[in-house]
Amino acid sequence: MTALNQAHCEACRADAPQVSDEELPVLIKQIPDWNIEVRDGVMQLEKVFLFKNFKFALAFTNAMGEISEAEGHHPGLLTEWGKVTVTWWSHSIKGLHRNDFIMAARTDEVAKTAEGRK
């Protein structure tokens, strides 16, 4: 199996399957610092990234925008002073798809080289 951070997203339609109960623990183990949150009955992956100031947080947000556009899969991004909260879920299936785990792993890769991390 390809490492999540090297995989690419596939097109996700409204009839695509959500991650199964069997797949979930296998996938979450590959992104151990991410939390599973449930909002309005929708399972999501979420992680907070800390930065030294707003400028660095904004640069990380913009970098996330670039990889999201390239993969055609977009997160919820909350940019605050010194902090960016990244939330992944698949809107079309109202839950988690393998794409969300791929992008969470790719987010961690971007964060490794992000300037100004705390």
Curated annotation (Swiss-Prot):
InterPro entries in the cross-refs: PCD_sf (IPR036428), Pterin-4-alpha-carb_dehyd (IPR050376), Pterin_deHydtase (IPR001533)
Listed EC numbers: 4.2.1.96
Listed GO biological process terms: tetrahydrobiopterin biosynthetic process
Reactions mediated catalytically: (4aS,6R)-4a-hydroxy-L-erythro-5,6,7,8-tetrahydrobiopterin = (6R)-L-erythro-6,7-dihydrobiopterin + H2O
Record keywords, A-Z: Lyase
MF annotations from Gene Ontology: 4-alpha-hydroxytetrahydrobiopterin dehydratase activity
Transmembrane regions listed in the UniProt entry: none
PANTHER family listed in its UniProt record: PTERIN-4-ALPHA-CARBINOLAMINE DEHYDRATASE-RELATED
Family named by the database record: Belongs to the pterin-4-alpha-carbinolamine dehydratase family.
This protein's name: Putative pterin-4-alpha-carbinolamine dehydratase
